Swiss-Prot record:
Pfam families: SQHop_cyclase_C (PF13243), SQHop_cyclase_N (PF13249)
Protein name: Probable oxidosqualene cyclase
Transmembrane spans: none
Alphabetic keyword roster: Isomerase, Repeat
GO CC annotations on file: lipid droplet
Organism: Cucurbita pepo (Vegetable marrow)
GO molecular function: oxidosqualene cyclase activity
Lineage: Eukaryota, Viridiplantae, Streptophyta, Embryophyta, Tracheophyta
Disulphide bond pairs: none
EC number(s) given by UniProt: 5.4.99.-
Amino acid sequence: MWTLKFSKGWETSDNAHLGRQFWEFDPNLQPSLEEQARVHNVCNDFYTHRFQAKHSSDLLMRLQLKKANGSEVKLPTQVKLRSEEEMSEEAVETTLRRAIRFYSTMQTQDGFWPGDYAGPLFLLPGLVIGLSVTKALDTVLSRHHQQEMRRYLYNHQNEDGGWGLHIEGNSTMLCTALSYVSLRLLGEEMDGCDGALRQARRWILDRGGATSIPSWGKLWLSVLGVYEWEGNNPLPPEIWLLPYFLPLHPGRMWCHSRMVYLPMSYLYGKRFVGPISPIITSLRQELYTSPYHMIDWNLSRSLCAKEDLYTPHSKIQDMLWDSIHKLGEPLLKKWPLSKLRQKALDFVIKHIHYEDENTHYLCLGPVSKVVNMVCCWDEDPNSEAFTRHISRIKDYLWLAEDGMKMQGYHGSQLWDVAFAIQAIVATDLVEEYGSVLKKAHDFVKNSQVRRNGFGDDDPSDWYRHNSKGGWPFSTPDNAWPVSDCTSEALKVAIMMSQMPPTMVGEPMDIRKLYDAVDLILSLQNSNGGFASYELTRSHPWLETLNPAEIFGDVMIDYQYVECSSAAIERLKAFMKLHPSYRKKEIQACMAKAADFIETIQQPDGSWYGSWGICYTYGTWFGIKGLVACGRTYENSKTLRKATHFLLSKQLKSGGWGESYLSAHNKVYTDLKNGKSHIVNTSWALLALIKAGQAQRDPSPLHQAATVLINSQLDNGDFPQQEIIGVFNKSCTISYSAYRNIFPIWALGEYQLKVLKRQE
């Protein structure tokens, strides 16, 4: 029986594994026949409707937590409104009480809410390939793991036989080829699962074979031994030896790209290839339209399937790769320049080890995690480093009714908790849920990063910004603070300090709040904007060298409306309570950030959301950041345009529903058939309330609140709808907690700032 475990492990940890979540199969646990039937039914239901509803609802976790929390939760009678005219405080309060009561049963004793943070389909194949080439596949993944992974891959195969970049996307060569390879490595036959693999293979071959897989796929297939390294564009490790003052030094890249291409350059420099087995030999025949030994690998370097191509290579980039491939690489293989290659490899592996140890072998993200692991195995298969990598794989795996997947992080723990606290505090029910807030507050207090790095080295030696005082997206073991995570957690700490300690626990030490403020101030760029993890270190023109055809805007850490707005709001809250600490610097920071937000507003009044879908998300942040700096509907044309934009997108139903295609195409796109989405609706409702819509015409707010109330399920939960997170323009990701958090937050604000004010 599968069980979800929390805060356990023998591995090193900064806070006794607080926030850790992983699934484990226990053969000694025997579920009842009723439990088996429930699990079977939810899994079978997902399979039946897999082409209509691509997103799982985290029902396996919900079943377990419901059982762990004892008897059925008693809820008030559900409210359903026939129209907004029936709206009342009682209806809103009943819905909120039902929602928070249900959501509180999903909270762990550690204070966080576990959940699915998957969605991209290129992550799991990388893990399967990485474990295969290190000869650890069957050791690390039990037959139960492998069975659930196969189920996940088949559940997300599109009707045309391929797999998308993410669960809602159209089929791509990258994920079709990698998923096909993964299923073969997981034991499936060539025509397995009633011809599903045969259909996938036909999809690949009909498009010219796997030679047109994008660059990340070329690397993984080369590592596996079913694609030649000569068919890759160069990733020379020597680039890490360049002077840092050069704009194209990799230390100036966005950290996620930097930490992925660091170990990739090691594997490229070593020309690493895993063991050649009969399955590898067979795959060399299955994936291509020509005999393997006759493929023109040099020509294949520049091939990319049209289904995958989001950011085409520039001519400058292709000229650069051609020059390095034809001139640089042959020279670097010969003495004495071969010594330079070895020096570069030594430099890179040293940085890999620093990242591993600094993050307790979690690494920044799932791609770098697996590539780092392969590098450590190549260096020494019996090393402690490889063993410690293996022990952290389960942190990235998540099980739901659609199968076992690899997440985009090892969870979104801190991020979800920070929003959940703000949502509950926004309601008029705080006193009823003090124990929930206390546990969540403790989690926030114990999740702050309290060090600047591993050991006594200067973080800049490893191309890192200071981290002390920040908060990460997940847990402090990750050790990568994020600007908006730090801002949101700071806001929570300030909010909790204003509430009775008997209800929510003791406030954070003021010195720790100072550390957070210091970090936020240090992250502001010269133009006033805030990026995600670090300062922006290079220039936008570097994007012309973006080698990842499947993503956009990955070369530098750009400034975002979300991060900039969060910084403004939280610094204002801090300054209100602690006006003596760096007041002038905070005021200047807020003013510059507000000016930046105004400069990046779109002509139609919206803001592009880079981390949520999409214009409703970005516009919510844009509005609340400007309001925090004193802008109002009356004195700000920017706010008036933003308000008009949101109102223009409201659907006849009263809600908002935005497709992931908005982010992909950079044009606002409704969901199919005019469907509303509870999270988009919540963001829009929050934004309009913040912009003072209630004082002008509350009717759109009543309509939106009606949609949210009528969307609530019988048990107090809210339905999982289309995927709502995004990154790098083209790929979506799950924020499974949003379906609970944001309806609570929006209805809470609506009750207190619209209905009660009308009275």
